[in-house]
């Protein structure tokens, strides 16, 4: 159950979605971008349970407890929004087959960590996106398609972009946060967010743990929030230490196993998710890594 937080040497200073260069990562590049522009209004958290060769099989108990954690995470997010006078209504839904059957699809390179970093970050990103499209196609094939008079025949979603578009229209929401849930509760791996700093494909997250804090943490990622601890997305030790001392109870610190009700959303994160229009000048240099 120990959380994997060590940095992979090949990562250098790049973000997964940002074009694979050695330039500094600027977390503002994920602000107000793509499908999950800002965490306001009506939003859908849609999650799909995935079994793979290297993860623990999902049981009915695991699935039910994850659904409970999602509800708690959403409750916490609604509480934070009310405290900040933000209009926010998150609903949740999930894909599951009959008798709690999941989608079985092996990760490209075994674990989440290996899949995103092997053989390198650029190739790993391509493979992860292809993997996610394959899952979206399986889920999309089971969705009911309503015929609309006078309109061309609508086909079932065949990739994650079309799946998100379908879910957005069907649920009449402004944004869709797409989660692929893998069961690493008793294993050592990471969660990861994809496509948050570009508009070439829709955002999604692969989430390894079912803690409410982990779920809220990764949902905020899709709306532009940045890690404050050492991950494959942040490596500057000096900045990590400052953010830890400045925001010790921030949800974007390592969320593993933490009681979500002891955590908060700092002004730093509020800026990145669109809850505030400006950020204190003292924190501007910490928006890069």
Feature names for model-found ranges:
Residues 151-196:
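Auxiliary, metal-adjacent structural segments of Zn-dependent hydrolase domains
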Residues 5-18:
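Hydrophobic h-region of N-terminal signal peptides that target proteins for export
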Residues 212-228:
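Active-site recognition of the HExxH zinc-binding catalytic motif
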Residues 52-55, 183-188, 209-213, 257-259:
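Solvent-exposed loop/turn segments at secondary-structure junctions
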């Amino acid at each position: 159950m120990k959380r994997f937080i060590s940095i992979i040497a090949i990562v250098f200073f790049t973000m997964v979605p940002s074009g694979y260069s050695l330039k500094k990562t600027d977390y503002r590049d994920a602000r107000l971008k793509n499908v999950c522009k800002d965490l306001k209004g009506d939003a859908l958290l849609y999650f799909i349970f995935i079994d793979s060769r290297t993860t623990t099989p999902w049981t009915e108990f695991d699935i039910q407890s994850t659904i409970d954690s999602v509800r708690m995470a959403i409750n916490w997010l609604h509480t934070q929004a009310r405290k900040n006078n933000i209009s926010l209504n998150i609903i949740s839904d999930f894909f599951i087959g009959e008798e709690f059957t999941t989608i079985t699809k092996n990760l490209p390179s075994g674990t989440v960590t290996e899949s995103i970093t092997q053989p390198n970050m650029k190739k790993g990103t391509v493979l992860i996106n292809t993997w996610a499209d394959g899952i979206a196609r399986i889920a999309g094939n089971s969705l009911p398609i309503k015929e609309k008079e006078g309109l061309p025949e609508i086909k079932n979603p065949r990739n994650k972009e079309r799946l998100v578009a379908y879910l957005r229209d069907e649920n009449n929401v402004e944004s869709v946060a797409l989660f692929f849930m893998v069961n690493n509760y008793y294993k050592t791996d990471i969660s990861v967010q994809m496509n948050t700093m570009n508009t070439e494909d829709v955002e999604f997250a692969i989430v390894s743990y079912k803690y409410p804090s982990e779920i809220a943490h990764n949902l905020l990622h899709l709306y532009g929030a940045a890690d404050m601890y050492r991950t494959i997305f942040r490596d500057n030790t000096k900045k990590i230490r400052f953010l830890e001392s400045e925001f010790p109870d921030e949800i974007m610190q390592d969320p593993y196993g933490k009681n979500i009700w002891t955590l908060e959303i700092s002004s730093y994160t509020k800026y990145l998710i669109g809850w505030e229009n400006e950020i204190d000048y003292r924190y501007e240099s910490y928006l890069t890594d």
